[in-house]
Regions:
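A short glycine-rich, Lys/Arg-flanked "PGG" loop and its adjoining helix->strand segment in the class I
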Residues: 138-150
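Class I SAM-dependent methyltransferase SAM/SAH-binding core
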Residues: 64-109
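Conserved hydrophobic residues forming the short capping helix/wall of the S-adenosyl-L-methionine
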Residues: 44, 90-93, 233
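SAM-dependent methyltransferase
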Residues: 155-227
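A short acidic, Gly/Pro-enriched loop at the edge of an enzyme's catalytic core
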Residues: 112-121
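Conserved class I S-adenosyl-L-methionine
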Residues: 2-61
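C-terminal lobe and adjacent flexible extensions of AdoMet/dcAdoMet transferase-like proteins
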Residues: 222-260
């Protein structure tokens, strides 16, 4: 019988279950890896971060950003709260002949990162809104501030919730994919409750014989506004807080550790 770990945080459990399928949420994951790597490399370079500087992808998932930057030669480490996502990233690195230090860690604490040790920290793909309160988000920002060296750069991407209509329930299909002779369909359902919403991810696989299997993964998000995030960044001690709309498919926020 498999072990059941009752101590796994809900967000970690969600991404543990999603890790084998995550690439299928993209029309072409390999292309997205390359495209996002190039976009982030240009952004980092514009802020003076070089390939030799120490960088942490602190919400790495299965490696959509880490793999692209590692392929371009960046000195990148990667962490995530999901063990299964980190293990999937390790497999992807080996398959590509790439190298990056990987570990399980919590974005709110980054307990394994030394203070003032990093030139840049990344947290992309709407990872911040998994933190369900301003208090938790502020803790994550203060932790990033601790880990960055003077002048260091924080980069994260989020949904612009203020621009989204509130439909309840909100059904969001990803589209049909094909894998190993099977058809795969992923659908998100958002159910709003105030400024938060429960997300149900329906993953359906159809075999060549027509047999279907559906698994439902559940998580919760805080629809925090970009304006509020900018305020929390300033409260955490960051300066030069900027929004960029032309880097990734979601808005990107950058902020710097003050130069002493």
């Amino acid at each position: 019988m498999g072990r059941i770990n009752t101590k796994v945080p809900p967000v970690a459990a969600f991404y543990d279950d999603l890790a084998p399928h995550y690439h299928l949420l993209y029309v072409d994951w390999e292309r997205s890896v390359a495209k996002q790597g190039e976009a982030l490399a240009s952004l980092l370079s514009a802020f003076g971060v070089t390939v030799a500087d120490p960088i942490l992808d602190a919400a790495c998932g299965i490696g959509t950003q880490t793999l692209g930057l590692a392929r371009l030669g960046f000195n990148i480490a990667a962490s995530d709260i999901s063990l299964m996502a980190v293990e999937r990233l390790q497999q992807e690195l080996v398959q590509r002949g790439l190298s990056a230090r990987t570990r399980v860690d919590d974005l709110r604490t980054l307990a394994q990162v030394e203070s003032s040790s990093l030139a840049a920290i990344l947290a992309c793909d709407n990872s911040i809104p998994h933190l369900l309160s301003d208090r938790d988000i502020l803790q994550a920002f203060r932790t990033a501030h601790r880990c960055l060296r003077p002048g260091g750069l924080l980069v994260f991407s989020v949904r612009d919730y203020a621009a989204l209509p509130r439909v309840n329930p909100d059904v969001r299909p990803y589209g049909l994919r094909h894998r190993d002779g099977c058809r795969f369909l992923a659908v998100q359902v958002w159910e709003w409750e105030g400024e938060q919403y429960d997300l149900s991810m329906y993953l359906t696989s159809e075999s060549s014989s027509g047999e279907c299997n559906t698994k439902v993964l559940r998580s919760r998000y805080y629809a925090v506004s970009i304006e509020r995030l900018q305020s929390l960044l300033a409260e955490a001690g960051f300066v030069e807080v900027e929004r960029h709309n032309d880097i990734l498919f979601q808005p990107v926020l950058t902020a710097r550790q003050r130069v002493v």
